Amino acid sequence: MVMYELFCITRPAANATRTSSPTLAMNIAKNCGRAILDNKGVVVDVESMGLKELAKPIKKLNQSYSFGHWWSMTFYSNPTVQSEIQRILRLEPSVLRYMIVKKADKLSDLM
């Protein structure tokens, strides 16, 4: 299995403040995690980085967003699972941006 890290920015809730709850982002993370586990992968870590101001506004669905909820997920899976995760994130209207980074081919590459 290969180690990956997923970074994602989701739109803030309609009444978002800097301390808003990350439930929208965590629901998306659960959907991605379920896809990983269904394909015999392992989710190592899910981290919420909170609501942050974006470097430049992101336009999506005829709206402009200056803030976004940032989160990341570290996981082991087969390379074919990436396409399923990308499909989930592409179809989710709350996702502003995402990126999947390959961290290591095997455990010995990390040491």
Swiss-Prot record:
One of its GO terms (biological process) is mitochondrial translation. It is found in: Mitochondrion. Gene3D superfamilies: 3.30.70.60. Signal peptide: none annotated. GO terms for cellular component: mitochondrial small ribosomal subunit; mitochondrion. One of its GO terms (molecular function) is small ribosomal subunit rRNA binding. Its main location: mitochondrion. It holds the Pfam family Ribosomal_S6. It comes from the Eukaryota. Keywords: Mitochondrion, Ribonucleoprotein, Ribosomal protein. InterPro entries: Ribosomal_bS6, Ribosomal_bS6_sf, Ribosomal_S6_plastid/chlpt, Transl_elong_EF1B/ribsomal_bS6. PANTHER family: MITOCHONDRIAL 28S RIBOSOMAL PROTEIN S6, SMALL RIBOSOMAL SUBUNIT PROTEIN BS6M. Component of the mitochondrial ribosome (mitoribosome), a dedicated translation machinery responsible for the synthesis of mitochondrial genome-encoded proteins, including at least some of the essential transmembrane subunits of the mitochondrial respiratory chain. The mitoribosomes are attached to the mitochondrial inner membrane and translation products are cotranslationally integrated into the membrane. Component of the mitochondrial small ribosomal subunit (mt-SSU). Mature yeast 74S mitochondrial ribosomes consist of a small (37S) and a large (54S) subunit. The 37S small subunit contains a 15S ribosomal RNA (15S mt-rRNA) and at least 32 different proteins. The 54S large subunit contains a 21S rRNA (21S mt-rRNA) and at least 45 different proteins. Belongs to the bacterial ribosomal protein bS6 family. This is Small ribosomal subunit protein bS6m. It comes from Schizosaccharomyces pombe (strain 972 / ATCC 24843) (Fission yeast). The gene is mrp17.
